[in-house]
Design a protein with these regions (language model features):
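Class I SAM-dependent methyltransferase Rossmann-like catalytic core
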Residues: 14-26
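Class I SAM-dependent methyltransferase SAM/SAH-binding core
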Residues: 49, 55-105
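A short acidic, Gly/Pro-enriched loop at the edge of an enzyme's catalytic core
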Residues: 105-115
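A short SAM/SAH-binding and catalytic strip from SAM-dependent methyltransferases
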Residues: 115-128
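Substrate-binding/catalytic lobe of Class I Rossmann-like enzymes that use SAM or dcSAM, i.e.
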Residues: 166-192
Length: 192
């Protein structure tokens, strides 16, 4: 069992490390826009949530792209405060709504969302767990864009395999992650 004090210290260190950065993980606006342009058509005013939003790079982009309201969910007040400031600076405060909550314990009604967006956050719950908890939140024709760490080779060197087997034991390859998404009730439209 992990030491709660050590976990809290680690989390505080990670927050301090990422404070003030535009993103708390991989990705960029160009890649995200390309993904959005390839999605199926959503309703004119889609109901959107960015889960594990950090300081909100994705939430801001989604609000601009769709001109729609975005629920930006994260547990970290510091990041949500940064997001609120950025939304004001960009004139998006009427569209971007920071929500301090556990993305794994949302109590929204079934079918409440047309688009779930989650960059670099699902692993905090475990990919399969995150998908299983989030699927009921999507409307029948809803879409989820969720990033996940994946092995791209069966022949990865021993050192990274050993590290990730300790750090994230359920990390899998792309084919297994597709199966996990399907088991959670998703039709996989593509992977990048």
């Amino acid at each position: 069992m992990a030491d709660a004090g050590a976990e809290a210290t680690c989390l505080a260190d990670l927050i301090e490390l990422h404070r003030g950065l535009p993103r708390q993980g991989p990705g960029d606006a160009h890649f995200s826009r390309r993904l959005l342009q390839g999605l199926p058509k959503l309703p004119q005013r889609p109901r959107i949530a960015d889960l594990g939003c950090g300081s909100g790079a994705g939430a801001l982009l989604l609000a601009e792209f769709y001109g729609a309201e975005v629920l930006a969910v994260d547990t970290t007040a510091v990041f949500l405060e940064e997001l609120a400031g950025l939304a004001r600076q960009r004139g998006l405060q009427h569209l971007v709504h920071p929500v301090q909550a556990d993305m794994g314990a949302l109590t929204w009604p079934p079918g409440a969302l047309d688009l779930i967006w989650s960059e670099g956050a699902a692993y905090n719950l475990g990919f399969e767990t995150a998908l299983a908890r989030w699927r009921p939140l999507l409307a029948a024709e809803g879409v989820a864009v969720v990033s996940e760490m994946s092995w791209f080779s069966e022949d990865a060197p021993a050192e990274p395999r050993e590290f990730w087997s300790a750090a994230y034991p359920t990390m899998a390859g792309e084919a297994e992650n597709r199966r996990r998404a399907q088991r959670a009730g998703f039709a996989v439209l593509g992977t990048e």
